[in-house]
């Protein structure tokens, strides 16, 4: 591929050549949110003789005096740098480039050195050489990398052509450059604190969340995936902790991990910081100067239909001075000048009451924002797996008498045997923590079990809800439980049932944010991002396969550590586990298994599917109208086919994989360091066969794309109306004879609302969910790449096109299922079609930006 025509080139007239090229980059712009003067200063620098230079590196001619590296050609400068004026928004600029290349001496170029002598960085996207001797067609270098001024680096910035090589196949002249680049990215000998121009990927534990919180990772009590290291100085009062930054300072992540478009990243960062530093104090003042509570559902709906006027507060005024001018109007309501007004969540757009129905409550277990929890019931009554020596007997108190009247004539045993009983079981998950959690101010949380019946028409219906609270008896944490069954609305008993569903939703909301979302997508992915960059060259086929699914993940995780999951952060403030939240997630991580994260394995583990070789995806759903699973299996299968076909190009047999030094180092470090607290678990794949690699890559892509999309982008559409997905419960279920019960009879909406998430928690929580549920206009969806020339391999390009085409076909199937009246779980009473796993591959223009409740981005970027 690379050497084609070389001999012909070296004989004949082409002993030297002038190679013409094109450079595409994005300059720092006069409207850049972070650096207003970048373009002006660069212009002055150019007149002083500064600029950008490039040097080609040979892939065929070796310089024995330079460690066997490929020979380096003469410098070439960008042409028309000054006259190519930037657009008003940060956009691409194109420049010419001409190389004097001695073909006879230097052979065929395969890499390029880029030097930046300007005073600010730029984003190098691609360099394309035309009519290169020794190659057919163009030679493209895909960079997508920020180039800082040369003085910031201890080494030259080298980029490789878009060819693909296993380590053993790399041209000898380029091998040292490949090894150098990986060594630079590992940066194991570099001391911090790291700056934004540093390109260092190292690991650290979660010791940066603030004082009074456990260190997550590196200890048996709180095992955890690793995060990216920043090398900030230790905390002054506790050296085992890393010091915190102020909210407007930037946490270090390697610059190429940050959002490609500056405005996108800054808008997200400023949005979250606006909520934390500006809107929160204003809302606190608002709450202090008003009754401080919502009293009816209409009060909450007014957030969307009318908004609330925020008072002037010093913190909000101060933030106005610190934020870039053009963001203030969008992000910061100031005094009476503007309202805090939120968009109407999808769940109440068509019908403001549908969320209260039992049908919608059950449907969201299959097609809501947390559709990954429901399991098939295999024994009755449900048993507990809690240690009886610590907790006693926690067997469920739900009896056959509670549920048999709603089983369509079946007995409990018949319903079990016919796969008609299902459970949302949060009992064991929360019971061990409830004594501590309920000692937090404003908390009273139950551990819940909810039983569902699969009706003959394919819909689920709730049968019973068990609410349990911990009781200390004889040195054991036993349970005091009560069972509630459905009651029609309109009576006080009906409102008791409504509250029982709300307590379940509180459990499910907490678990969703803490585990389904944060731990099982964001946190577990970061070690793969770090290890891939440390051990897989950009020329490696597996790097090319996985890198799109890492975009922006380290950035959003760093932002989360700074403002969301930190001590006293928004998560602790708005979701019930409070300061115990992250510690609880560490306990859950003890049982995390990478091999169970793929969708088919997860469905089988939960009893929602069985293996079936005759089914299209080799598994058969036991609830056929399970929108998350039905759409997800189609997506999983498409990813699986793509990965298998792609890897087959480069790994004809297992021996090639076993001899791949980079993949073996990558997998070893992922297991032993990135997920090092679980390194001795027996389930880790050995990475000795191509099917093992294919399954691992499919799982990584699934987690970063579809799984995250399923649990993230429905947050505001479903939970933006807090009564549907409350995050906190503040008091016990009202009992007859109490004032709370009398209030429930007298003013049921007020009693309901005063039991769940408070007004200030609601306003802050839904403001955040709105930000986190949006798609950016430059979103890259599954089946899309940021650069068409991501590889020079026509076989790989063809495999990827087939993948994209399959995803577009799935889009049509999803829309078709949503219009099928037989599939009642696709829309539900709220008339909100399930589109969270609609790929949106066909949208190449960013038309579906904002709160769309659809689309599978390539990566965890928000």
Swiss-Prot record:
Spans annotated as Disordered: 212-241
Class of this enzyme: oxidoreductase
Gene3D superfamilies reported for this sequence: 3.10.450.60, Lipoxygenase-1, Domain 2, Lipoxygenase-1, Domain 3, Lipoxygenase-1, Domain 5, PLAT/LH2 domain
Superkingdom of the organism of origin: Eukaryota
GO biological process terms on file: fatty acid biosynthetic process; lipid oxidation; oxylipin biosynthetic process
Stretches assigned to the Lipoxygenase domain: 164-862
The protein, known as: Linoleate 9S-lipoxygenase 1
Organism from which the protein derives: Hordeum vulgare (Barley)
Gene coding for it: LOX1.1
């Amino acid at each position: 591929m690379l050497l084609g025509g070389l001999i012909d080139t070296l004989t004949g007239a082409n002993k030297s050549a002038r190679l013409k090229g094109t450079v595409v980059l994005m300059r720092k712009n006069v409207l850049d949110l972070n650096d207003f003067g970048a373009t002006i200063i660069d212009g002055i620098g150019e007149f002083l003789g500064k600029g950008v230079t490039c040097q080609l590196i040979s892939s065929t001619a070796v310089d024995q005096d330079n460690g066997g590296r490929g020979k380096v050609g003469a410098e070439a400068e960008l042409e028309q740098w000054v006259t190519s004026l930037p657009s008003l928004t940060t956009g691409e600029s194109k420049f010419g480039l001409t190389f004097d290349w001695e073909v006879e001496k230097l052979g065929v170029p395969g890499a390029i050195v880029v030097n930046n002598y300007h005073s600010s960085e730029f984003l190098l996207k691609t360099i394309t050489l035309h009519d290169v001797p020794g190659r057919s067609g163009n030679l493209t270098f895909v960079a997508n990398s920020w180039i800082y001024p040369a003085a910031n680096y201890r080494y030259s910035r080298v980029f490789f052509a878009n060819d693909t090589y296993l380590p053993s196949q790399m041209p000898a002249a380029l091998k040292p450059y490949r090894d150098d680049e990986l060594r630079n990215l590992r940066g194991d000998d570099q001391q911090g604190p790291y700056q934004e121009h540093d390109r260092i990927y190292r690991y650290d534990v979660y010791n940066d969340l603030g004082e009074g919180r456990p260190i997550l990772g590196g200890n048996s009590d709180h095992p955890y995936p690793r995060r990216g290291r920043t090398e900030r100085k230790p905390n002054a009062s506790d050296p085992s902790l890393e010091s915190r930054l102020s909210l407007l300072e930037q946490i270090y992540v390697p610059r190429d991990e940050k959002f490609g478009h500056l405005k996108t990243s800054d808008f997200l960062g400023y949005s979250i910081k606006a909520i934390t530093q500006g809107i929160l104090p204003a809302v606190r003042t608002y709450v202090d100067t008003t009754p401080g509570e919502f009293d009816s559902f209409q009060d909450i709906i007014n957030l969307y239909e009318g908004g609330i006027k925020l008072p002037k507060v010093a913190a909000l005024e101060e933030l106005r001075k610190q934020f870039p001018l053009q963001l203030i109007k969008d992000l910061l309501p100031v005094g009476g000048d503007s309202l805090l007004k939120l968009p109407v969540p999808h769940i109440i757009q068509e019908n403001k009451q549908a969320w209260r129905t039992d049908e919608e409550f059950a449907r969201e277990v299959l097609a809501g924002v947390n559709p990954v929890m429901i399991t098939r019931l295999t024994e009755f009554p449900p048993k507990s797996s809690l240690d009886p020596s610590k907790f006693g007997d926690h067997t469920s108190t739900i009896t056959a008498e509670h549920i048999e009247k709603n089983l369509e004539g079946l007995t409990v045993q018949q319903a079990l045997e016919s796969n008609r009983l299902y459970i949302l079981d949060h009992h064991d998950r929360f019971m061990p923590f409830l004594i501590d959690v309920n000692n937090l101010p404003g908390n009273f949380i139950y551990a819940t079990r909810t039983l569902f019946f699969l009706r003959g028409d394919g819909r689920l219906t709730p049968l019973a809800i068990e609410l349990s609270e911990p009781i200390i008896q004889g040195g054991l944490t036993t349970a005091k439980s009560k069972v509630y069954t459905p009651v029609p609305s309109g009576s006080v008993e009906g409102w008791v049932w409504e509250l029982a569903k709300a307590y379940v939703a509180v459990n499910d909301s907490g678990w969703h944010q803490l585990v389904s979302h944060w731990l099982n997508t964001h946190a577990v992915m970061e070690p793969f991002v770090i290890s891939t960059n440390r051990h897989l060259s950009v020329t490696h086929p597996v790097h090319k396969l996985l890198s799109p699914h890492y975009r922006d993940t380290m950035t959003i995780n760093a932002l989360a550590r700074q403002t969301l999951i930190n001590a006293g952060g928004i998560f602790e403030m708005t979701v019930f586990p409070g300061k115990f939240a992250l510690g609880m997630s560490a306990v859950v991580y003890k049982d995390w298994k990478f091999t169970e994260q793929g969708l088919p394995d997860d469905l089988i583990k939960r009893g929602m599917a069985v293996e079936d070789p005759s089914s299209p995806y080799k598994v058969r759903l036991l609830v056929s109208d399970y929108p998350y699973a039905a759409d997800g299996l189609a997506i999983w299968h498409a990813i699986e086919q793509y990965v298998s076909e792609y890897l087959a190009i480069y790994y004809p047999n297992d021996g090639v994989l076993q001899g791949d030094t980079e993949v073996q180092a990558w997998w070893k470090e992922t297991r032993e360091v990135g997920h090092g607290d679980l390194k001795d678990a027996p389930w880790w794949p050995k990475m000795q066969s191509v099917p093992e690699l294919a399954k691992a890559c499919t799982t990584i892509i699934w987690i970063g794309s579809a799984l995250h999309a399923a649990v993230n982008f429905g947050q505001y559409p479903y939970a933006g109306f807090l009564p549907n997905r409350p995050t906190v419960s503040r008091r016990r279920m009202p009992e007859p004879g109490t004032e709370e019960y009398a209030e429930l009879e007298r003013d049921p909406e007020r009693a309901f609302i005063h039991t769940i998430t408070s007004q200030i928690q609601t306003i802050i929580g839904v403001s955040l969910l709105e930000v986190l549920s949006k798609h950016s206009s430059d979103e890259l969806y599954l089946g899309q790449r940021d650069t068409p020339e991501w590889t020079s391999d026509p076989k790989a390009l063809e495999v990827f096109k087939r993948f994209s085409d399959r995803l577009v076909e799935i889009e049509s199937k999803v829309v078709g299922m949503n219009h099928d009246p037989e599939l009642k779980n696709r829309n539900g009473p709220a008339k909100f079609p399930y589109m969270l796993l609609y790929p949106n591959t066909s949208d190449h223009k960013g038309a579906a930006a904002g709160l769309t409740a659809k689309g599978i981005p390539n990566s965890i970027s928000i």
